[in-house]
């Protein structure tokens, strides 16, 4: 994965069914930042790190009923992303794919 901005369409498996959203990752060297859009809201990701194709970050999601702090761990393989978001309420498998809208890396040329 090169430095740049990547947009993924993601789907999270929850006890109430699948939830769809977007994950924007901004990669610079071994650091990540960006946004997770889920439950019709956009949340910044924090403390993002990358080692090869393995990524990790944390953040907080807010639903109608509560706020959920999470730790995300996963990997990127080609155009696919696979994450596990771990919260105090359990772990949620999240998968997705690179979209064509912003999926091409932004270079500093």
Located regions from the model:
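Central antiparallel beta-sheet cores of small beta-barrel/beta-sandwich binding domains
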Residues: 1-77, 82-109
């Amino acid at each position: 994965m090169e430095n740049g901005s990547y947009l993924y369409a993601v789907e999270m498996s929850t006890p109430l069914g699948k939830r769809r959203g977007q994950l924007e990752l901004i990669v610079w060297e071994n650091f990540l930042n960006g946004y997770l859009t889920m439950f019709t809201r956009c949340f910044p990701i924090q403390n993002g790190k990358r080692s090869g194709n393995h990524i990790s970050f944390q953040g907080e999601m807010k639903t109608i009923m509560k706020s959920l702090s999470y730790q995300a761990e996963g990997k990127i393989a080609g155009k696919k992303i696979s994450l596990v978001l771990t919260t105090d309420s359990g772990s949620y498998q999240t998968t997705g794919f690179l979209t064509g809208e912003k999926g091409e890396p932004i270079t500093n040329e």
